[in-house]
Amino acid sequence: MPNSGGEAPEMTVPAPIAMLAELTHRCPLACPYCSNPLALHGKARELDTQTWARAFDEAAALGVLQLHLSGGEPASRPDLVELTRAAHEAGLYTNLITSGIGLTPARLDALEAVGLDHIQLSLQGTTPDLADRIGGYKGGFARKMAVAAEIKARGIPLTLNAVMHRHNLDDLERTIELAIELGARRLEVACVQFHGWATRNRAALLPSRAQTEAAKRIVAEAEARLRGTLAFDFVPPDYYADYPKACMGGWGSAGLNIAPDGTVLPCHAAETIPHLSFDRFPDKTLREIWYEGAAFNAYRGTDHLPETCRSCDRVNIDFGGCRCQALALAGDPAATDPVCSRSPDHHKVTALLEAALAGGDGAEFTYRRMPRKG
């Protein structure tokens, strides 16, 4: 809970263990499920190399162990190698989250040389036609497969991140086979979450309940069969769950995000909560923001939750669910996440499901493309 007594905040709030560094919002793909904010930051507003390096040093001093270099497409940054070196020198385990577009063999060599620990490669589909249609980028699948082969040849640990939805969930078994062929150590079967741009494509993307149940069965069988070969992270669609996820392990509990312009966020979608005020780095230090920032303290703990949550035996398991989803679906970020079957607003999720599934078969993608001016 937020510090309300005389103790220093460092005594009551745990240090973060992970940080997501959104180096840029620029991206060559146009995925209809993009979770980045509706308002994107152009190149001119991005933090420079030295400022990011300072952020990495401060993150390590704060207690962060894992750094995820993300975007947009982080390979859009010409200084990606320098940023990776700075992260490694700060002592952070560094993971690159990428579409693969922009990663040449020479660039992979340079990234490996400066200490990159891990790559997380996105996968839109298992065939060129499907993947290129979903990503809105012709030739993207072929380039991705070439990059994956280069990663495998170098022995860089690889996670494949497959965002699954109505159009590719039936291809899950082939997705698992492809992960093994590419030498991935982990496969994230991440059913699309409806935040940011993805909400515009809910009808086109939401899988059926039958697809979701089949996916659960396929993942469970594959986990047992491939134990020791391929690890799995399965994120089912929120809307079919009985209980919400423990979003971010609890607001302001385990991780923080830095947007391309230096805005420091408790979670990826936090800027959708309009009454919150967010601090920027380097205007304030990461330590100040983590422990004292108003946005980080707004929903820490469970005191803000309604009685439905506070009296529930799951309150310290899921922390009432996602604050951003509570706002989007219930109109109140302090409410019980309507995904929860015990929420008084759960009927709104049922209505969304019915509407999306009724109109989804013929729905077209609205692709995400960044305006050219930065």
Curated annotation (Swiss-Prot):
Binding-site list for [4Fe-4S] cluster: 27, 31, 34
Radical SAM core domain boundaries: 13-230
Residue ranges that the Swiss-Prot or TrEMBL entry lists as coiled coil: none
Catalytic activity: [PQQ precursor protein] + S-adenosyl-L-methionine = E-Y cross-linked-[PQQ precursor protein] + 5'-deoxyadenosine + L-methionine + H(+)
Gene Ontology annotations of biological process type: pyrroloquinoline quinone biosynthetic process
Classification via PROSITE patterns: RADICAL_SAM (PS51918)
Any Pfam family hit: SPASM
Residues in the signal sequence: none
Cofactor binding note: Binds 1 [4Fe-4S] cluster. The cluster is coordinated with 3 cysteines and an exchangeable S-adenosyl-L-methionine.
Known EC number: 1.21.98.4
PANTHER family recorded: PQQA PEPTIDE CYCLASE, RADICAL SAM DOMAIN PROTEIN
Its biological purpose: Catalyzes the cross-linking of a glutamate residue and a tyrosine residue in the PqqA protein as part of the biosynthesis of pyrroloquinoline quinone (PQQ).
Subunit: Interacts with PqqD. The interaction is necessary for activity of PqqE.
Protein name according to UniProt: PqqA peptide cyclase
Native organism: Ruegeria pomeroyi (strain ATCC 700808 / DSM 15171 / DSS-3)
